[in-house]
Amino acid sequence: MSGILTRWRQLGRRYFWPHLLLGMVAASFGLPALSNAAETNTPARTTASTASKVNFSHLALLEASNRRPNFTVDYWHQHAIRTVIRHLSFAMAPQTLPVADAPSPLQAHHIALLNTLSAMLTQEGTPPAIVRRLSLAYFAPQTAFSIPAWISQAQGIRAGPQRLS
């Protein structure tokens, strides 16, 4: 019985908690950081009225502005990022000392990952550049349903010309 508990504790320490923490860090970057309590107490009818006035021509800009109003990282984000950096530092440490060997691409990737995470803690976040002009793709409406056209659109298969004109 104690062997099972020991294995379960080792599994949690090695795999579960670091992956859960990494998932929390990754998911938290997409969520807005609430700076004051006034934002949380907005009535539901104002949200519904603003949703009805949305201009749908710039959906990408709306998604970015709604998802990231502030670019601050609060204390718990910093704590989670530091813990992930600590876990990655120990996990990516070389087991043996190389003898004047060139660094492998995997080691360079690990170093770049750690540098990126530490830069997220030390550098001030900047909002992404706003794209002023969006080019929309033109889709010609089809007059009648045809199975070959549907297959080519759904599966990406083109078996011949769509129109014989």
From Swiss-Prot:
GO terms for cellular component: cytosol; periplasmic space. Pfam families: SecM (PF06558). GO terms for molecular function: translation regulator activity. It comes from the Bacteria. It is found in: Cytoplasm, Cytosol; Periplasm. Its main location: cytoplasm. Residues 1-37 form the signal peptide. Keywords: Cytoplasm, Periplasm, Signal. Regulates secA expression by translational coupling of the secM secA operon. Translational pausing at a specific Pro residue 5 residues before the end of the protein may allow disruption of a mRNA repressor helix that normally suppresses secA translation initiation. Belongs to the SecM family. NCBIfam families: PRK02943.1-1. This is Secretion monitor. It comes from Salmonella paratyphi B (strain ATCC BAA-1250 / SPB7). The lineage of its organism: Bacteria, Pseudomonadati, Pseudomonadota, Gammaproteobacteria, Enterobacterales. The gene is secM.
